[in-house]
Amino acid sequence: MADKGTDNFDLEGNNWYIVHEAECTDSIDTLDDLCDESNDDSNISNLIDDDVVDQGNSLALYNAQINEDCDNALAHLKRKYNKSPEQAVAELSPQLQAVKITPERHSKRRLFQDSGIFEDEAENSLTQVESESQAGPSSQDGGGDINLLLLQSSNRRATMLAKFKEWYGVSYNEITRIYKSDKSCSDNWVIVIFRAAVEVLESSKIVLKQHCTYIQVKIFGFSALYLVQFKSAKSRETVQKLMCSILNIQEYQMLCDPPKLRSVPTALYFYKHAMLTESSVFGQTPDWIAKQTLVSHQAATTAETFELSRMVQWAYDNNYVDECDIAYHYAMYAEEDANAAAYLKSNNQVKHVRDCSTMVRMYKRYEMRDMSMSEWIYKCCDECSEEGDWKPISQFLKYQGVNILSFLIVLKSFLKGIPKKNCIVIHGPPDTGKSLFCYSFIKFLKGKVVSYVNRSSHFWLQPLMDCKVGFMDDATYVCWTYIDQNLRNALDGNPMCIDAKHRAPQQLKLPPMLITSNIDIKQEQSLMYLHSRIQCFNFPNKMPILDDGSPMYTFTDGTWKSFFQKLGRQLELTDPEEENNGVPSRTFRCTSRSNSDSY
C-alpha cells in the first residue's frame, strides 16, 4: 500500500530548488511588517493603483447602446418590407430607367387577389388608419385633429387653404389680397381661425365689438371665418396679437389678410353670408360691400366717365391751386365722389392734375384782376377765420417813431395805386423788424415775393402778374442801381411789358411794391431819380426780444384783419356788400351741376 501524502522522489543533485516545507522566521512578527519589508526592497513603483474609482454614467452608455440597436433593427425592417417607389428611377434619370439587369418577365395572371400577408400588409394597415380617422365623429363638425395635421404637414399654409376651401366653399385667395409685409395697415380684415374652442369663438363676438365697427362671424365646428372692420387701421401683427389674446390660440392657427375691396364676387360672398342664419353680424354694412351690392349705391356710382370740369370746380371751391395739393386731396375724395374714383382709374392722372391746376389759376387770376383793392382786402378778411387786435401794429409803429396818421395817408395812396406813390420803402439798421412787419402784411393780402438774385432770368418778374401786392426784401445798392436803370416804370405805377414763360410778353400795370432795405436812398444822390417815386419810413430801433427768444410785437392774419376792419374808413375802403346793397354776388360755376354747394 502506497504512502499517503507527498511522495518524495529521489532526485540527486536537484534538492536546491525543491521546497518541502515553509521555513519559519522569527524576525517578522506581523503581516504589515511583511508588506512594508517587501515594499522597501521592491524596485517597481506605482504597481498598484490606489486612486478612487470613477464609475461614470453607465446608464447613459446603456441607453445609447440600446438606441443604436433599435435604430439598426428598424433600418433592417424598413429595407425588408418597404418597397421603393416605381417612379423613383424615372425621377433620377430617364436614361437610367432603360437600363435593366434582369430580363423582363410577364407576371402570371391571378384569378383571385393576393391575400396581402406578405406584400401588402403595410398598405392595408395605412388604409385602415385612414378609414378610422374619417369615421371619427370630430370630422363631421369641420374640426378634426387640425392641430396635429398642421404640425405634421410640411406646408401649413397649403393645408389651411385646402381646409378653408373644403369647409367654406370658396378659395381663400379669391376673396383676399395678400399683404407681403406684416406691418401694412388696413381697416378691413378677413380672419380665419382653426381649432379653437367653441365657447371662445362665441364670446369673441362680444369682445370684438369694442375694437370694430362691423363684425361678421361664421362658425363651422372648431373653425371660424371673420370679416371685421376696425375703428382704426391695423397691421397684420396687431390683428394676430389681438386674436391670439382673445381666442387663446397660436399664430399658426390663423389666416389673416385684407379682403378685395373692388371685387364684386367678394362683396357678394360676404353679403350672402351676412343673410345666413349661421352668421352673426354686428354693425352697419361696410361701404365697399354696399357700393357693389345695394341698388341705391350702384345707381350713385354709375357715372364712371371722368369729367375734368367737375375736378376743376372741386379744386376752385376748395381753393387748391398747386398740383401736389390737387392730386393728393382729390385722390382722398375718391371714396365719396364717383368722378374722383374715375380719376383714380384713369391712366392720365398727371395730365388731368396739370390741366386742373392751370384752369384754376386762370379763374383765380381773372377774379383777382376784376376785383378792386377794397374788394380784395375784404375778401382776404372773409377768408381769415382768426381773430386778433390791431393795436400791436400801432404800438410797433409808435416804437419805431412812425406817426400812425402819416402811415395811414401813405398806405391809402399805396393801396389806390396812385402814380409816383405806388412804392413804400422801409429802411433802417438790421434786426429792427422790417422784414417781419412786411412779410406779415404780404401774407395776409396773398402777395408775391420777387428776389433780385433771379435778375438774370427773363421771367423773374412773372410772379407779380398774379398778385395785388408785390414785395422785395433787403434791396442792396446794386439792386437799387438796377431798379434805377430798368424798373422806373414799375415804381411809377404805369403799364409796362413783362416777359412771361410760354407766352408772349404781357402788357400790364405792376401791383404796388413794398421794399425793405438797409440803405436810405433819399441820401444817395446817384439815385435821385427814384426819390420822387418812393415813400420812405425809417425803423431805427431794434426789435425787443422776450426771454423765450420771441419778438415782443407779433403780427398775424388776425392782427391785419382787425387793422383793416377798424381803419377801413380812414383808408377809404368800401365794403362790397354795401356796394351791392347787401346782396351777395353769385358764386362761380364751371360745371353743369344743379346745386352749387354740393362740393
Curated annotation (Swiss-Prot):
Q: Record-annotated residues binding ATP?
A: 428-435
The record places the cross-link (Glycyl lysine isopeptide (Lys-Gly) (interchain with G-Cter in SUMO)) at 509
Q: How is it modified after translation?
A: Phosphorylated.
The EC number(s) given in the record are 5.6.2.4
Q: Which residues carry this modification: Phosphoserine?
A: 84, 93
Q: Give the matching InterPro entries.
A: Helicase_SF3_DNA-vir, P-loop_NTPase, PPV_DNA_helicase_E1_C, PPV_DNA_helicase_E1_N, PPV_E1_DBD, PPV_E1_DBD_sf, Rep_E1_papillomaV, Znf_lg_T-Ag_D1_dom_sf
The lineage's top-level taxon is Viruses
Q: What processes does the entry annotate via GO biological process terms?
A: DNA replication
Fill in the subunit field for this protein: Can form hexamers. Interacts with E2 protein; this interaction increases E1 DNA binding specificity. Interacts with host DNA polymerase subunit POLA2. Interacts with host single stranded DNA-binding protein RPA1. Interacts with host TOP1; this interaction stimulates the enzymatic activity of TOP1.
Q: What does this protein do?
A: ATP-dependent DNA 3'-5' helicase required for initiation of viral DNA replication. It forms a complex with the viral E2 protein. The E1-E2 complex binds to the replication origin which contains binding sites for both proteins. During the initial step, a dimer of E1 interacts with a dimer of protein E2 leading to a complex that binds the viral origin of replication with high specificity. Then, a second dimer of E1 displaces the E2 dimer in an ATP-dependent manner to form the E1 tetramer.
Q: What is this protein called?
A: Replication protein E1
Native source organism of the sequence: Human papillomavirus 4
